[in-house]
């Protein structure tokens, strides 16, 4: 009996441990204040980020991309089924703590349907396909908060800046993307290593929320129309059979 209970506990622990979501936050060595801000931003959530030293490059976007690829390489080395990646200007939205557990559970349940989850997407490309609290889309940018599955690691490592351009563009082209609406995270106003100046992307996130709403409305309207057509077809068949009797 003890052995059976022990095996049950062992099996339960294995399943539960696979659902654990390790988190890395990319942070350059000369930006300790940004690391502290990000840690503080996620206090009170179930996310405990581990600092990942960012890679410095004379062209900021190349160093940014190399840092993201390095995390994919580390996740592959560790055999992680998935990994959460933050950039050090990431801020969770006000209701993050209430919504994140549901989104995380849905991501695990639907894990065979996606390669990357973007928590704060910009420049969203439809059409959209609702999957419960998730939505599958054709493309989007922004990597300040995302979950990468093991299915994407090899392609992530194949990124070449001279051939593929910015890392978020490459990921958008290569991976099956899911998002959630409203979004879970934005970027706070700060100095951008890519832009080499202080930037405020608030307008992009507001625009993206609007685009997501439109895409979801179109998808649900389309589903409703299809459902109505199917219902009408079934009704016509029933009427035809009744006349034949």
Show which residues each predicted segment covers.
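An acidic/histidine-cluster motif and surrounding catalytic segment
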Residues: 2-86, 90-245
């Amino acid at each position: 009996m003890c052995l059976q209970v022990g095996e049950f506990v062992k099996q339960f622990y294995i399943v539960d441990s696979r659902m654990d979501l390790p988190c890395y936050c990319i942070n350059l060595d000369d930006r300790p204040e940004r690391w502290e801000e990000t840690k503080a931003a996620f206090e009170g959530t179930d996310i405990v980020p581990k600092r990942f030293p960012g890679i410095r490059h004379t062209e900021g976007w190349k160093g940014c991309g190399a840092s993201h690829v390095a995390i994919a390489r580390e996740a592959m080395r560790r055999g992680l089924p998935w990994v959460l990646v933050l950039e050090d200007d990431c801020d969770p939205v006000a209701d993050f703590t209430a919504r994140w557990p549901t989104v995380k559970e849905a991501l695990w349940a639907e894990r065979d349907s996606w390669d990357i989850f973007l928590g704060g997407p910009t420049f969203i490309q439809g059409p959209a396909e609702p999957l419960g609290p998730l939505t599958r889309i054709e493309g989007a940018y922004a990597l300040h908060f995302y979950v990468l599955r093991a299915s994407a690691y090899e392609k992530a490592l194949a990124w070449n800046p001279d051939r593929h351009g910015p890392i978020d563009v490459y990921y958008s082209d290569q991976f099956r993307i899911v998002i959630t609406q409203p979004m879970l995270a934005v970027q706070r106003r700060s100095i951008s290593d890519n832009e080499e100046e202080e930037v405020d992307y608030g307008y992009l996130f507001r625009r993206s929320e609007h685009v997501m709403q439109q895409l979801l409305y179109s998808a649900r309207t389309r589903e409703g129309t299809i459902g109505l057509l199917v219902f009408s077809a079934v009704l016509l068949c029933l009427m035809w059979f009744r006349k034949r009797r």
